[in-house]
Amino acid sequence: QLSGNELQRLSSHNVADALRYFSGIQIKDYGGVGGLKTVNIRSMGTNHVGVFYDGIELGNAQNGTVDLGRFSLDNMESVTLYNGQKSAIFQPAKDFGSAGSIYLQSRTPKFENEERYHVKTTFKTGSFGVVNPSILWEQKIHDKLYSSLSAEYMYTTGKYKFRYQTKDGYDTTAVRQNGDVQALRVEGGLFGKIDQGYWRAKAYLYNSERGYPGAIVRNKFSHEDRQWDTNFFTQGTFKKDFSSRYSLLCNIKYAYDYLHYLADPNKDESLMYTNNHYYQQEVYASAANRFTILPGWDVSVSADYQFNLLNADLQDFVYPRRHTGLIATATAISLDRFKAQASLLGTFVHDKVRTENESAPDKQEWTPAVVVSYQPFKSIDLNIRGFYKRIFRMPTLNDLYYTFVGNVDLDPEYTNQYNLGFTYSKSFSHSWLRYIEIQTDVYYNEVENKIIATPTSNFFRWTMINLGKVEIRGIDAALQTGWQIGREFRLNGRINYTYQKAQDFTDPYDEFYGGQIPYIPWHSGSAAVNANWRSWEANYSFIYTGERYSSQANILANYQLPWYTSDLSV
């Protein structure tokens, strides 16, 4: 978890940047400065990652991805990563439904004594013409009701110099074009306290326009593709402990997403005219119940319903609608130094289309998970943990229904996860080293029925099929330390390292059978150091991504060099 001041020290501007400091994470950045930023946990694929904002999942039924670049850290209280699922069982059914989860918790107003309001303004600027002002206003309406308003604007030209070389000796320095971005984010919230509980309501709006610089092909350096996005949602949460044995958690949400993509041959003769508009709507409701059977033994039952629709102005578009029901039951036992949790999730999906085309058949799946942890020694803070989880992801609406590409006969994509690890921490009171924490995990993951795109008999027309199988073996390691040198100098550090061998075992007759899957490095890691002396503070952070390949063909032509970044702030 990254929270509070630790987030601010990392020189990160959005959630995607901050997530680079976790082990086992790959950030996919499509389109450079203004591109879509998604996250891949332990190489299982972006679609297997659930992203939750204030406890409710962010959805995208069209393509299954969430752009993390549109969530700022200026209004963020914590960013937490879970492999498998949260250790808490009191949660909506959807929280059990991902191979890995990221929880974004926005700031909750906190006031002391006679404080009535807080105001925070920031202005950031930097390379590539970045202008990034923001404001946060928190108001205490009365003792049991607070409000919050956050707004942010970001603009960048996206122009930066780069070197371009070809095999025939051509070598030049060029400036990246059509990488500009302007985006506005506004969100407001109400926070209420009730007896033995709370309620929250939030509204969020994000509006952006950006260019896509594209790849350099045959010495063509500029592109004119443009995209406009509008994302809006409003959501509410109610939680109350009715007694020491029963608690209720309810969530509700409505979301609207609009995307406009334009490729205009009047500006770029190499483009085929494309002027597409997509409209998504989502309605979601959830109720979770927790029962305390005995001290140390809890049981939860939760039920969710979600409705998604997708409209577009494409020829022969089928206008899909999806109804999803989820039921989860879970139990957790805590016996002194031993803890165990088991859950079973039922998922029921029904699709309809508004045309005479065939819709995908109904899907019904039951998927289990088991989590255990044990502290062998009472006086030593050493915890051994492990989990097994089987989960799946439904084909997205694009996978099933995209014009000329979708395939309604697709099966879900399954994952099996096995994890074994430990955490050790110790505090010291009479030495320079004040605390140390070590975490290590060894894991093995399988991805079955992997959904991929493949060309048909007409190479210019592709379709979606179930074909791939991937096996992932990896190690995540993390070290955190705190030092007190003298009375006034403090030093904190964290190091993360990941080793992953993610192999493609789709076709045993393939020349590159068993090769590392695209863009997954064998080695990656990060480091961050924070130094404090009196009222001064210095922060240094480092991110490393090792060598990798751009295709499952692990040959020299597809080789990608390692890269690293360093950030220093005072």
Over which residues does each language-model region extend?
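Extracytoplasmic beta-strand/coil segments of soluble accessory domains associated
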Residues: 16-57
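A beta-strand signature from Gram-negative outer-membrane beta-barrel systems
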Residues: 73-120
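Short loop/turn motifs that connect adjacent beta-strands in outer-membrane beta-barrel proteins
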Residues: 109-117, 143-144, 196-198, 241-247, ...
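Transmembrane beta-strands of outer-membrane beta-barrel pores
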Residues: 123-127, 153-157, 194-196, 205-209, ...
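Flexible loop and strand-edge segments within Gram-negative outer membrane beta-barrel domains
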Residues: 160, 173, 177-183, 196-248, ...
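Membrane-embedded beta-barrel scaffold of Gram-negative outer-membrane proteins
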Residues: 245, 249-263, 377, 383-389, ...
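Structural signature of Gram-negative outer-membrane beta-barrels, strongest in the C-terminal barrel
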Residues: 294-445, 528-530
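Gram-negative outer-membrane beta-barrel transporters
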Residues: 435-446, 463-552
